[in-house]
Amino acid sequence: MVSTSKIKSVDFYRKIPRDLTEASLSGAGLSIIAALSMIFLFGMELNNYLAVSTSTSVIVDRSADGDFLRLDFNISFPSLSCEFASVDVSDVLGTNRLNVTKTIRKFSIDSNMRPTGSEFHAGEVLSLINHGDETGEEIVEDSVPLTGRNFDTFTHQFPILVVNFYAPWCYWCNLLKPSWEKAAKQIKERYDPEMDGRVILAKVDCTQEGDLCRRNHIQGYPSIRIFRKGSDLKDDNAHHDHESYYGDRDTESLVKMVVSLVEPIHLEPHNLALEDKSDNSSRTLKKAPSTGGCRVEGYMRVKKVPGNLMVSARSGSHSFDSSQMNMSHVVNHLSFGRRIMPQKFSEFKRLSPYLGLSHDRLDGRSFINQRDLGPNVTIEHYLQIVKTEVVKSNGQALVEAYEYTAHSSVAHSYYLPVAKFHFELSPMQVLITENSKSFSHFITNVCAIIGGVFTVAGILDSILHHSMTLMKKIELGKNF
């Protein structure tokens, strides 16, 4: 049986009676410094243990979300009408989707980007069957040519004024011309302007009356506008826009359209109508809407290959003057991939505090052409997309996000100008992994801090004590 004395012999911490120890002022000072150092270093170690540390690596893209990528956008075009705004998508694999509408919404806006109503619905804009009468007869011009000087007079004089805004070089305008003039003749015979005075058909040459056409926000030719008592303002379910005709363009269809507009209007006695014409026009005159722009928003699924998102004016029955098109725009939002949920985004930022500075790089940026760049200006954006994946310490993928860099430029186009977003995905991805920390490592470091400081302080105290003792002995030797 092992005796108690033998067990005591392995004691590392043998006690010295307090009566045999001696306290000193220098030792007390070192003890205070050592205690403060222990507390400070322990706090630093605890902070380091609680802090999140990550490691970043670049690996080959291992996306698990398939071959398609979600693209969300919200872009405002102050000079492009929703009537003709078209969203197109193409890629290097041959995909070419024109005028995407299923997941796209359009809202008319004014020049200050303010919405002028609810969602824009174009209806059957581009589904014309007849573009005009096929005739070889000589065209007799019966429609009234309008200019900037007499336009307001005619719009106030007639309760219904149907105007064809055209350009002589336009193919569709030339197809419309015979049926338009024949319809004008039939309407003039049916509703005599002098005796009836309810309706008249007119035309405006936009190559000669550019200011007048711009004032009425004419962007495509031909544009058939309907003016009622001096204004073409249409108020439909809080949506304010220009009233236009989108139907067939043969003579019969045009006449039928005009008759449907005139029939609800009560025919006044001729003299009374002439007497009250100016008063009625002043009372019922409405300010023309400043609805010349469009906000296009929505999403689409694009393939993970280099591709293009383009917004331009497009129509199967209109022509456009490229020199008058202005593709200025404001990118309200543009992002790739699924949106990060708010509860995950806070964790996302916690693991990577610097991530997100380049997220949605184009958001809020304006690209305005003040006509100082000349005509036919295409605005291009080159986007390089990199996927970033954040993985927690337990191996769980927290979130997958797509960030991009953006470089923008302008180019003079030989064709119709567009707003073009070229996107290209990197074959590599950034992997951010949370580093796990061992609690045993933390305890080891704390013990090392306490023991190390205590030992170093003891060594310093011993050196200081022996130095002072030696100095006292030297002084005593000198006195003898």
From Swiss-Prot:
Single GO cellular component term: membrane
Glycosylation sites: N74, N99, N280, N326, N376
Membrane topology note: Single-pass membrane protein
Superkingdom, natural source: Eukaryota
UniProt-annotated site: Lowers pKa of C-terminal Cys of active site, residues: R249
Main subcellular location: membrane
Residues at the active site: C170 (nucleophile), C173 (nucleophile)
Keyword Transferase: no
Cited CDD domains: PDI_a_family (cd02961)
Transmembrane segments: 439-459
Keywords, in A-Z order: Disulfide bond, Glycoprotein, Membrane, Redox-active center, Signal, Transmembrane, Transmembrane helix
Tissue localization of expression: Widely expressed.
Location relative to the cell: Membrane
Function: Acts as a protein-folding catalyst that interacts with nascent polypeptides to catalyze the formation, isomerization, and reduction or oxidation of disulfide bonds.
Similarity comment text for this entry: Belongs to the protein disulfide isomerase family.
Protein known as: Protein disulfide-isomerase 5-4
Organismal lineage: Eukaryota, Viridiplantae, Streptophyta, Embryophyta, Tracheophyta
